[in-house]
A protein has these predicted regions:
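N-terminal "arm"/small-domain region of PLP-dependent enzymes with the aminotransferase-like
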Residues: 2, 23-65, 69, 265-268, ...
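Phosphate-binding glycine-rich loop
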Residues: 64-111, 125-129, 135-137, 202
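PLP-dependent aminotransferase class I/II
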Residues: 72-76, 84-87, 148, 152, ...
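PLP-dependent aminotransferase-like
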Residues: 102-191, 198
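Conserved active-site segment immediately N-terminal to the catalytic lysine
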Residues: 189-222, 238, 263-268
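Short beta-strand-to-turn element immediately C-terminal to the catalytic PLP-Schiff-base lysine
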Residues: 213-214, 227-232, 285
Length: 422
């Protein structure tokens, strides 16, 4: 009986191989075929030109490596870009979120609602303040946090919402702002993916109570590391300045004692050393000059991917949000498991064998052991969990050539068709 079963399976496998040959399919590299690419391509990469290098060299030759004029220059440039009244730059995107949570008044026992499909910092910033993250599910087509799920999660302990502009497409800021006003909550927009994006004609960074940016190398513009918090609220702005620099001030209006002299300063809050260096700021100022080019190229690549993958029934393309003119940070491709003979992990590995190195953004935050120990369990956000099981992040960055883009499309198509469920 066992031998008969094995013979049957061998026969089926042989027929499938013959069918693929008849259809002219190329064998995937993981099955012994030839890789689409000779060299590896990764999901993200910074773009640094001679102007960026010169900007950094100029600072290195100057008197101010930190706490110098480039900080104010960068903050002014961010305000001009977004229309926000105030910008406070800092050491990284996580620091920006922590500062924003502190400025929002998050403390022990407070709840803050966020999405599980994000980097851990979006929730960790709440824990830093002694609060508790509450996870709300995502829209199954846009993958952004669902405003109705946010409102359903509000309790008397809710203090704020951290809404992530996932992949660079804006969250529904009108609806989220309405919900937050109705319930007296602070809206913190985690805009790590969204610099250069507009929502209904207004720049992200000028709409929410606070918006945070990240300038990690895989982001659209980079300072090596770096972050920023933008706001239109002067009170929040002054708090952010304190939290960035140890809670120390030289402003007489903020001091409790009379100044002894020009050297005098006071610590009036418990803050941190979250300062950005002038070296980072100079690089970012130069990078921001290229933001329109970066945005346009990313949009071109996304459009080409969408055109290619929308035709394949075993793949699902993320829904475009028409109100969001986006600087796309990530390209998320989703497999349709019932139409394939392989799962996401196998698809991922097959692409790697073609020298197309993808990633997965993100593991739901509450899956991590640290969060499990805090009492979070799987099943909280079904849409987010299903997305995680099916998604891949494809290469997307400014320096990709047309040939790079077409090689990614060829590799994905090759694998999707070869392993199509018949």
């Amino acid at each position: 009986m066992h031998e008969k079963c094995m013979s049957f399976l061998t026969l089926v496998a042989g027929r499938r191989t013959e069918e693929r040959k008849i259809r002219g399919m190329k064998k995937p590299a993981i099955e012994g075929g030839t890789p689409v690419r000779e060299t590896k391509i990764y999901y993200g990469h910074q773009y640094i030109d001679d102007a960026d290098i010169q900007a950094v060299v100029d600072v290195l030759k100057s008197d101010n490596l930190t706490c110098g004029p480039k900080i104010g220059e960068l903050e002014e440039k961010l305000c001009q870009l977004t229309g926000a009244r105030y910008a406070v730059v800092c050491s990284n995107g996580t620091a920006a979120l922590h500062m924003a949570a502190m400025a929002a008044g998050v403390g022990a026992g407070d709840e803050v609602i966020t999405t599980p499909i994000t980097f851990a910092a979006s929730a960790n910033c709440v824990l830093y303040c002694g609060g508790r993250p509450v996870f709300a599910d995502i829209d199954p087509e846009t993958y952004n946090i669902d405003p109705e799920k946010v409102e359903a999660a509000i309790t008397e302990r809710t203090k704020a919402v951290v809404a992530v502009d996932y992949t660079g497409q804006s969250v529904e800021l009108d609806r989220l702002s309405e919900i937050c006003r109705k319930h007296g909550l602070v809206l913190i927009e985690d805009g790590a993916h969204v610099i250069g994006t507009t929502y209904k004609g207004r720049a992200n960074g000028s709409i929410s109570d606070m918006t945070t940016f990240s300038f990690h190398p895989v982001k659209t513009v980079t300072g090596g590391e770096g972050g920023a918090v933008l706001t239109n609220d002067e009170t929040l702005y002054k708090k952010l300045l304190l939290y960035r620099a140890h809670g120390i001030t030289r402003e007489e209006a903020q001091m409790e004692h009379e100044a002894d002299g020009a050297w005098y300063y006071e610590q009036v809050e418990l803050g941190y050393n979250y300062r950005m260096t002038d070296i980072q700021a100079a690089l970012l100022i130069s990078q921001l000059d290229k933001l329109p080019l970066f945005k346009q190229r990313r949009k071109e690549i996304v459009a080409r991917y969408n055109e290619a993958f929308d035709r394949l029934p075993m793949l699902f393309v993320q829904k475009e949000i028409p109100e969001s003119d986006t600087t796309r940070h990530l390209y998320i491709l989703r497999i349709v498991p019932e139409r394939l003979t392989i799962d996401r992990k196998q698809f991922f590995e097959a692409l790697a064998a073609e020298n197309v190195c993808c990633n997965v953004h993100y593991i739901p935050t509450y899956y991590f052991p640290y969060y499990e120990k805090q009492g979070y369990k799987k099943g909280l956000c079904p849409n987010a969990e299903k997305l995680y099981e099916e998604m891949l992040s494809l290469p997307l960055y400014y320096a990709m050539t047309d040939a790079d883009v077409e090689s990614v499309i060829e590799a994905v198509t090759k694998i999707a068709l070869y392993y199509e469920q018949k």
